[in-house]
Amino acid sequence: MPGMRRLLIVLLSVVPLYGASPEIFRVRLDTTKGPIVIEVHREWAPRGADRFHELVTSGYFDDSRFFRVVKGQWAQFGINGDPAVATRWRGRTIPDDPPKQSNVRGTVTFAFAVPNGRTTQVYIALKNLADPQDAQGFVPFGRVVEGMDVADSLNSEYGENAGSGIRAGKQQPLFDGGNAYMDRAYPRLDRILHAKVIP
């Protein structure tokens, strides 16, 4: 038992503890095209809302690229530009939330490859994606309340080529090379300059 207690103390000293996020909060993404404001509803997806709050308040999204933008479909982000940081978070999965909201235009949802596999990648629905996203377990945790025109204007010239979705299995260069790779291979990707919780 003393060994378990020591292990717990060590774990608590190296793993940051984040509590529950506020029930409703707003996040402003200052992007290269202008601001996008997301209103998060914890009731929709508690685990997703808590993780998003944790990522924003830790600075994870700052200087990250919108690496997967398909015009009229989605705008995806959430791979940190520092390969060490991105890799460290890649294995920190959260359990699924039961669906309560539909993937309609403007909703914000975690992407994932397998059940209970959400980590850091998020997409904004640029159109109604309820079919097939709802049936596949993609659970919105928020919605864009300001700046949907900004989301629509994000550079989509690279489409699925700059990493694609998690399930496509083509993201390793983004994790290995970070922003240096993305800026070299896809220099016109739009990015998040800074993300923060706002009143």
Q: Where on the chain are the PLM-derived regions?
A:
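Sec-dependent N-terminal signal peptides
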Residues: 6-15
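Cyclophilin-like peptidyl-prolyl cis-trans isomerases
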Residues: 17-199
